[in-house]
Amino acid sequence: MNQVSDEAKRNVALSLNKYGILKFGEFKLKSGIMSPFYIDMRIVQSFPEAFHNIANIYAELLKDLPQDVLLAGIPEAGIPLATAVGYVTNRPLIQPRAKVKDHGVGKLIEGEWKPGDKVAIIDDLVAKGDSKIEAIERFKECELEVVGFFLLLDREMGGKQIVEQAGYTLEAAMTITEALTILKEENKLSADQYREMIAFTRENQ
């Protein structure tokens, strides 16, 4: 796995907190589990500083990826992320449609590509991993080879292992534990808050 710098991790963690992308409270996850925190990556593009820091950490994560590998974001949160990462890394981008049009050319995946091309999937985070497995099917239908997933955050809920058991690599720039630890060190979280978040993470691994 490519290592990203401590400075990049710190910049991202502080941005997630500063702009309310990482929220604290009581939230119901897709799995039905109640969580004391939630990461709302769908608002990232509204905050240029956060968007910049996040695009840069993806660039570090992808630095050893061959230049001919296409990037693709998973709708919806992954699309603006992949677009920003493609721009800062000068990489070609394709985009799976959330819903196939019934007019025009009716493409499953927008952009220039051909069967046999390799694709790196960009997404925001992984929790249980089921949505990642589902996403692969669209690319397989188009005979594109998925080389792996590249994400900002691993929520450490077993999703990484599920994806890897399916035969795909998954690299995250940082874990939720790393992000929470940075916020505690920067006095953005109290000791009690930190203990609660870490306990939840450990209980749901």
Each language-model region and where it sits:
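PRPP-associated nucleotide enzymes
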Residues: 1-122, 126, 130-205
